[in-house]
Amino acid sequence: MKKEHVSHCQFSAWYPLFRSLTIKSVILPLPQNVKDYLLDDGTLVVSGREDPPTCSQPDSGDEAEETQWSDDESTATLTAPEFPEFNTQVQEAINSLGGSVFPKLNWSAPRDAYWIAMNSSLKCKSLSDIFLLFKSSDFITHDFTQPFIHCNDDSPDPCIEYELVLRKWCELIPGAEFRCFVKENKLIGISQRDYTQYYDHISKQKEEICRCIQDFFKEHLQYKFLDEDFVFDIYRDSRGKVWLIDFNPFGEVTDSLLFTWEELTSENNLRGDVSEADALEQDSPAFRCTNSEVTVQPSPYLSYGLPKDFVDLSTGEDAHKLIDFLKLKRNQQEDD
């Protein structure tokens, strides 16, 4: 995998080419000060919200005591930076997409941070919602700090213009998502995306699903993407229509799901796990799904559910983070 392959999978690199096949989205340049804020792990305080003013005062008439209270309160308050111009741009984009969005950076979405949201969802209605997810996500940090870590060429790192991608929120059923692996412009493998769960309809319809994805690939993607080796994600709706969701590099930086990268990069045939009828077709990809509830596995995102911020809380190292987190949760409840 080369650095240019990673660059070609940035959202802004492929979206103009395949706009009609995917979910409506808006791309906004990410200001440097916003990037700096997102990478600052010193505080969990999130910008974009105002705390309500304090209405009560100590009942004691002792002025010195009141003054001391005020000083302590001031010292304990952490102030988040504000980005009024960027906030306006983001809110206008969110409104244009129906009021709710799925956010991501150039490559990754903060899927590992869903647990921190009020509704355990990546659905965002404001910049502060996005900031909370981004600042809690290792995937987002990876985009910023190590996008080319698995590349094997020695060329200089391409210059990356970071962008906030806002995708119109759609309620997608996990059992209808699939990841597809393309090698030398040939579709070689299809994997159930949410492999931690068993879906009866996938097992029953896998040959139909496989043909549907093959047709989509041949008509819309084959020989049209910027590279001959790549990974793409699709969603197949209840009517059988296939929607393009994302592109990923063909390499270890991308989760191979029910395959292994050793299998995908070797010269061996992957089609040993499909029906005999399909195996007779030269172009038939391997199709893998979770075949029974016995093989259900825990979610791969569970390991991301305990961030350093909360470890700090458990050891008493940073109580300010708990205060800021509770304030944010309170404001979210008031907005709802």
Curated annotation (Swiss-Prot):
Q: Give the keywords, sorted.
A: ATP-binding, Chaperone, Cytoplasm, Magnesium, Metal-binding, Nucleotide-binding, Phosphoprotein, Ubl conjugation
Q: In which tissues is it expressed?
A: Frequently detected in granular vesicles, in the cytoplasm of some epithelial, stromal and sperm cells and in varicosities lining nervous fibers, while it appears to be absent in endothelial and smooth muscle cells (at protein level). Widely expressed. Expressed at high level in testis.
Q: Where is the composition biased (Acidic residues)?
A: 60-73
Q: How is it modified after translation?
A: Phosphorylated.
Q: Where does Mg(2+) bind?
A: 246, 248
- BP GO annotations: eukaryotic translation initiation factor 2 complex assembly
Q: Where in the cell is it found?
A: Cytoplasm
Instruction: List GO terms (cellular component aspect).
Output: cytoplasm
Binding of ATP: at which residues? 104, 107, 109, 111, 167-170, 177, 179, 193, 233, 246, 248
Supply the InterPro entries for this chain: CDC123
Q: Which GO terms describe its molecular function?
A: ATP binding; magnesium ion binding; protein folding chaperone
- Which superkingdom, per the lineage? Eukaryota
Q: Where is this region: Disordered?
A: 48-73
Q: Which family does it belong to?
A: Belongs to the CDC123 family.
Complex and partners: Interacts with the eIF2 complex gamma subunit EIF2S3 (via C-terminus); the interaction is direct. Interacts with the eIF2 complex alpha subunit EIF2S1. Interacts with the eIF2 complex beta subunit EIF2S2.
Question: What is the protein's name according to its record?
Answer: Translation initiation factor eIF2 assembly protein
Starting at the broadest rank, the lineage of the source organism is:
Eukaryota, Metazoa, Chordata, Craniata, Vertebrata
Q: Please state the gene responsible for encoding this protein.
A: Cdc123
